[in-house]
């Protein structure tokens, strides 16, 4: 547990603040109440009645109970006097009052002596308060219930509490009660007890002085008695003048319990020892002098005697004797007492007024103190809450840091484990490389031994080969059987062809039958067409549908034709396959015939094969070397590309700087434009102002002229008035003058306002001009900077051009390298083709060797095998030397690459330094020279790279030549092999082939290829490990850079926040201190605009001036004391503030450390998370790619299945289409015939239509005639009616004629409508046909 986490720290801060506040107000209240105590001492001279003995007994009983319950806490001890006062105030009304004698008023000299003594004791008390904080809490809390006396807490009790820490709580309770009794003691006791307290301090501090005699104890008892009687309590209330009897009763009620407490305390042994120690050195003479000065009444004397009787029985006789002789003296004392009472009453009246004022001041000060206490409590509460919150945050942050540390340790352990694992892998790889070299040597030796053993075996296996040759003859027989089977298959294929032809014949027959059926149907349909001639309009619609159907049928026919063509192509393919099978059968026959002759040139073929194998292996080695060389070149290209990327990034940075400069220049242009705009605005304003001023000046001149003219007119009018004194004219003139005066005043006011506006506008113009001048200066500065930047930009552009040229060169080099890589890939393809050809040749040679039946001699073959073994050994040696040379080359290339990387890193650092220097200082000649040197170095490097590339090109050209030579040799070998084949066909051999030797050779070759593959895999693993290491280094550098940048950012943020918080905290403390001082000293006024130090100095000077003005008054001293205390409080507060600041600084440092550690770990975790995300993304991409491939394969399978189904479906549809085709052909023919018939019918109908049109014309003419006749008949009827000659027969005939004519007209109209409808239908039909 640290200091800030302990409970002691939580409790200590608020307790210290509370004690300081209470001490301050306690001391302040004590000093302000000193004058009130002097006034109250004068009131104590009044007669105070005492209580009866019964009441004393009851009080003693109550006191015993209180002593038993005295072991209370500090809060209980505070509540005791309040309850006590309330009970006494309620009990006063029912009790009988007995007068008690009062002390005589002290003289002014005694008051001065008392003040001096109190001033001496004040520093002693303050030292006690600062040393004993626990003891000082008790009196600070007991001051609150407004005590009258100014007596401080006795130091003897504090010393006793220090000496006796093991006492019980009852002792503490009794000590608290003693303190309450002493607060109510009279000022006479104060004067006597002050020196006693000093002496008791010395006794308690040293522990040397002790009580020795019983006489001193008796004297101490005598001292306590009058002091108890003298103690009084006078409350500070406004109603003191109205009822003094109640005041006296309250005083008595408060005195009596104190007296009883004093009597009971003297009875206790422990309390007696303390009082003996306090009053040990009091002189008896001083006690007698104090008694002589005091005047007692009879009742008071009796009370004193009763108390003395209770104390000691020996003194009673002496008191009785002295009382008899002093009766006369008492009479004189009574007379003097009456006089004193009169004086005291006057003083009391004065003091009551003073008390009222003091009470008012006390109330105001109490209110202020309560407000201050409330604020301080609120402040303490807020501080405690903030402290708790801060502590919780600290705990949380501490836990988080612990968790992060645990995580960091885990990560570190993981990294260490990974590093150890990588080291193990590197060791394993090194061991594997060493093991492979050892294994190669051991394998080579083992292979030699195996070859020797195989040589011995070959002799034994020759006998077995003869048996194998017999088996081969059996295989030949089996091949002949296979040929017979193929012939059978051909016969079956011919049968199938015949079946297909029969199927086609059947289909043609069916097609012809279908055609005949269609013809019969066509005849039936012709009959139906003749019967359905009236329904031609309906058939036209069906014809449209049929035409669409015909189009579909045509398309289906085309598809069917294409399918038939595909079937024909398949049939042709089958025929071609049959022909190929026949050709193969013929070849087999020729091979069987030629197998009898081929064994003379076997030895020569073996030699040629051995030489070819050597050459092939050499070419393979050279190709492997070229492949390694190309891999190294690819790595170098990658490094160069990385360099290019870095240079491009630097160029981008420089471009960003140039863009920023361009943006700054653009902003400058904008500023210049805005300045020009403002200048134009200013000019416009100036012109407007000048125009307004000129207008106003002209108006002013006009008004002056008018004023002069008016004055002249006034003078003329005055002359006229003097000549002709008419009152009306005079009044009119006066009115005119007044109106013109008012106009002049308004004009003057307008001029004044115009002048004021002109002045304001001139001020605005001046301000705008100043702003314009400042802006022009800024523009000039910016232009100067821009010029500097332009020079820098020109340099940057030159550098960019150089870099661009270098990039072009690098790109050209990359393109050349890519072209070379493509050439190499093509050459590899050619080499693979050559290998395949060589393998084919080997297979042919093997077949030839198998086909050999005879060999010349076994000894020649053995010699050839030995030669082959020697050649293999030579090849292995050459391979070893080549591998060693390649390893050396790789090591040198690796060193060269490392040197290039170091140079690149140095160049990067140099470029960064140059960029920083360019930002700090605009173009410097030294840096330019350095850049030029760097460029020269890069050019030299480019030249080196070009030379290297040229060397590589030369190597490639030489290798290309070698490959061409090898190809030419292969061609020669092919020609020789063909010649050998021909010779073998001509000559037959009877010797068996050596298959086992060929198998051994092939096994050796396979082993060599496997070793080469292992070497390649090991090289790839080493390169992969190097790449991983380089990637890890780059990631570490990037992480370090990110951490440094984040640390800088966080430090800046923390410093800014800490500065702002400190300033706010200091300002808050200063404001609080100012408010406290203003509340304490409201009369002092200091301007608030000053700084805190100047304000404090001014605040110190103002009270001093007030003190100089009121130097004679006692209030000045009190204020000085208050100022001292305030200064002390201020120092204490400053110390606390400094402590808080130190604590805050420590906490801020801890927080910064925590933040740094947290951010570091966060960055590390972020890096790890990014890596994991990248890996996850890669896995996801691979997974998605695999899923896509799976889906693609599924789709392909589905497509294949669909295609199969479609194929089957199409075959079915073909059959259906063929059937439908036959039907459709017949239908088409029928439709053609129908079309021809319809056309003929249409022609006949057109002729008929023309005839009908002629008939219609005639009918219309006839209708016109009929209508004219009708009209004439109607005219005749009208004539007959007029003539009244109309027989009934003629009328009936005319009616019938009219009816018949109407019927004929309606019929003709219906016919016309029908003809029109037919015409419209035929027109539509023609449109459809067209």
From Swiss-Prot:
Lumenal side: 30-1330
Coiled-coil ranges per UniProt: 332-1329
UniProt-listed InterPro entries: Kinectin, Rib_rcpt_KP
One CC-aspect GO term: endoplasmic reticulum membrane
Expressed in which tissues: Expressed in male brain, heart, kidney, liver, lung, spleen and testis.
Biased composition (Basic and acidic residues): 123-135, 172-182
Membrane topology (Cytoplasmic): 1-6
Job of this protein: Receptor for kinesin thus involved in kinesin-driven vesicle motility.
Protein name in the entry: Kinectin
Organism of derivation: Vulpes vulpes
Gene name for this UniProt entry: KTN1
